[in-house]
Amino acid sequence: MSSSSVVDHSPHDSAPSPLVPTASNLILIDNYDSFTWNVYQYLVLEGAKVTVFRNDQITIDELIAKNPTQLVISPGPGHPGTDSGISRDAIRHFAGKIPIFGVCMGQQCIFDVYGGDVCFAGEILHGKTSPLRHDGKGAYAGLSQDLPVTRYHSLAGTHVTLPECLEVTSWIAKEDGSKGVIMGVRHKEYTIEGVQFHPESILSAEGRGMFRNFLHMQGGTWAENERLQKAAQAQAANTKSDAPTPKKSNILQKIYAHRKAAVDAQKQIPSLRPSDLQAAYNLSIAPPQISLVDRLRNSPFDVALCAEIKRASPSKGVFALDIDAPSQARKYALAGASVISVLTEPEWFKGSIDDLRAVRQVLNGMPNRPAVLRKEFIFDEYQILEARLAGADTVLLIVKMLEYELLERLYKYSLSLGMEPLVEVQNTEEMATAIKLGAKVIGVNNRNLESFEVDLGTTGRLRSMVPSDTFLCALSGINTHQDVLDCKRDGVNGILVGEAIMRAPDATQFIRELCAGLTGPVPKSAAEPLLVKICGTRSAEAAAEAIKAGADLVGMIMVPGTKRCVDHETALSISQAVHMSKKTGSTEVSSQASKSARDFFNINAEIIRKRGPLLVGVFMNQPLEEVLEKQHLYDLDIVQLHGDEPLEWANLIPVPVVRKFKPGQVGLATRGYHAVPLLDSGAGSGTLLDLESVKKELEKDEQVTVLLAGGLEPSNVVETVKSLGPLSERVIGVDVSSGVEEGGKQSLEKIREFVKAAKSVR
């Protein structure tokens, strides 16, 4: 191009365009290039709110936490594979989530990320202006052909290695009309574009138009962008000065659009299609559920607690990325939460349906467990069915997001699956909608979803509209016990707390202070005396003597061919001796305790302790039918499985099951099956367990309690248990067989000595 045709296309009017709502948090990655300023200038002039980070001054997690609306990768020196810092990782993460635009090296990063080769372009082009041909789409929409654009590069992506997922969008035409060096690429599915030239150069024509087109792109895919653009155009066409507030606005609109695209895509995956989910539900494989309303009304606190699991939010970014959902849920449950709310939205809240599934699993077998809430942007019956199959007891329906017809349809569908939804409102209009719907549980969001401002008085002001039999929850901004007292004063029945608990160093202590106003460490319950099991019993006399000495469990061996196996008549006489000694009295627990969740092993230990003395039948690798027959025949109170029997057998046996494990064996801490795990070195081997391995086992799960067996005798039982240190509190009982024998026969004196010694431990 001759010097006479050189035109200065730089912005002569420095007044920026009106802010683009969809470009409110654009992040520009600076690859240490002077042109980055010009890119920044053009973006701001076209209405974007831009923050710049150099490519080695921010981590990917920090970048994710910024929750950008768009991502722009700047030009830069060097090769994208070695000199682009975080740029390529940023493209990988945000691809399919938000619009991405790459300039010069930025385009080369896109090319490289998807497997193309970036190499020498055939000539060094620094300041060369060339006429650009383009496809008129995306960033080039509405722009003329043969635009003069300026090039500053010696590298470029090659035609022969063009990744399958990318298409060429612009090029410098050769004299024969064929396509020359690639000047632009676009991802075929994701909202990603790149240009090799510099639209921000003063010698490039219509550069601002390219940036303007990019800033108005929305969503992570072209399909999503098209849908949102049509929706925006339709809304603009129908907008009147007196029009009501749209149902979906600002961040809600963005999240809704993203989730809609994700759900639509998921429905196409074999095994996750709507028909697949319905087939699974028809087989009744969804976990058992409980009533949301009943669980909320059965709270240990004056104001019921819905404790939330979320790692991030649109307003606060990432704040608890490393917390795992099931561990946190167990803390919530045992601290008194009535509901556990699980965020399952992956991009803005960093959750997933797998979090909910894991939370439900960790609550298995827990008496008075909390209800599980799927907190998600629900707009489709598919999401509700998916939640039920994962173990949810309830789902969230946000009135602001849903037209009444859809809201009512989703509400009724949830009820058809046995789930009373939590219906979220924010103002009087939405509250009236929820009441019209017939919602039994209504949550008032104290946070304005458009401004993110919190007003704790919102719930109280809406209380007068709520029927007396409707459960009312405050959903945001609760941080202190005084906040809870204020809610109670305003007639609020429950609170939902998320970020404050997730940030707390000790979730259990935080809940105690928040809900009950109690400070200081959680008091420990007095340690119960050790349970004592005398096993290998071969006479009614020995059984009676063991019970007289204070034994809680009397075991007899039911394994044919073993030296301690008893015959039919002896088994009957032992059974009679044990059952004639049964304790009498109430086994009720306090009404306060019944309102809190209990760990499965903890409650079973209490039940066994209250019902003793109990008769235990020991089996090893025998048919289930034989176990069931002998349990009935000898009126066994407990069945002990000492072999390789499946865990599931415990649910087929009509009495509690004690199951033998070695330290480190899989399944020991699995809830909902065996009532108590028994740690043993071997079947009557008389060999002491390796106590270090016992400690490691107990340290894995702070709620697991065990019976201890193997090599115990009157002279070492006290020392063995106490050598476990603080972990000894988790040993609820000891089991002895050969340790109370002399000459292969049970010694009544040793039985008495063992019981006395064991009971002296605590």
UniProtKB/Swiss-Prot annotation:
Active site: C104, H198, E200
Domain Glutamine amidotransferase type-1 span(s) in chain numbering: 25-224
InterPro entries to which the protein is assigned, alphabetical: Aldolase_TIM, Anth_synth/Amidotransfase, Anthranilate_synth_II, Class_I_gatase-like, GATASE, Indole-3-glycerol_P_synth_dom, Indole-3-GlycerolPSynthase_CS, PRAI_dom
Region: N-(5'-phosphoribosyl)anthranilate isomerase, residue numbers: 531-762
Residues the record lists as binding L-glutamine: G76, P77, G78, Q108, S154, L155
Record's keyword terms, sorted: Amino-acid biosynthesis, Aromatic amino acid biosynthesis, Decarboxylase, Glutamine amidotransferase, Isomerase, Lyase, Multifunctional enzyme, Tryptophan biosynthesis
Superkingdom of origin: Eukaryota
Record-level GO BP terms: L-tryptophan biosynthetic process
GO molecular function terms listed in the Swiss-Prot or TrEMBL record: anthranilate synthase activity; indole-3-glycerol-phosphate synthase activity; phosphoribosylanthranilate isomerase activity
Record-listed E.C. numbers: 4.1.3.27, 4.1.1.48, 5.3.1.24
Catalytic reaction annotation: chorismate + L-glutamine = anthranilate + pyruvate + L-glutamate + H(+); N-(5-phospho-beta-D-ribosyl)anthranilate = 1-(2-carboxyphenylamino)-1-deoxy-D-ribulose 5-phosphate; 1-(2-carboxyphenylamino)-1-deoxy-D-ribulose 5-phosphate + H(+) = (1S,2R)-1-C-(indol-3-yl)glycerol 3-phosphate + CO2 + H2O
Pathway assignment: Amino-acid biosynthesis; L-tryptophan biosynthesis; L-tryptophan from chorismate: step 1/5; Amino-acid biosynthesis; L-tryptophan biosynthesis; L-tryptophan from chorismate: step 3/5; Amino-acid biosynthesis; L-tryptophan biosynthesis; L-tryptophan from chorismate: step 4/5
Annotated region described as Indole-3-glycerol phosphate synthase, given as residue ranges: 251-515
Entry-linked PROSITE patterns: GATASE_TYPE_1, IGPS
Subunit architecture: Tetramer of two components I and two components II.
Database matches in HAMAP family: PRAI (MF_00135)
PANTHER family on file: MULTIFUNCTIONAL TRYPTOPHAN BIOSYNTHESIS PROTEIN, MULTIFUNCTIONAL TRYPTOPHAN BIOSYNTHESIS PROTEIN-RELATED
Functional note: Trifunctional enzyme bearing the Gln amidotransferase (GATase) domain of anthranilate synthase, indole-glycerolphosphate synthase, and phosphoribosylanthranilate isomerase activities.
Protein name as catalogued: Multifunctional tryptophan biosynthesis protein
Source organism of the structure: Neurospora crassa (strain ATCC 24698 / 74-OR23-1A / CBS 708.71 / DSM 1257 / FGSC 987)
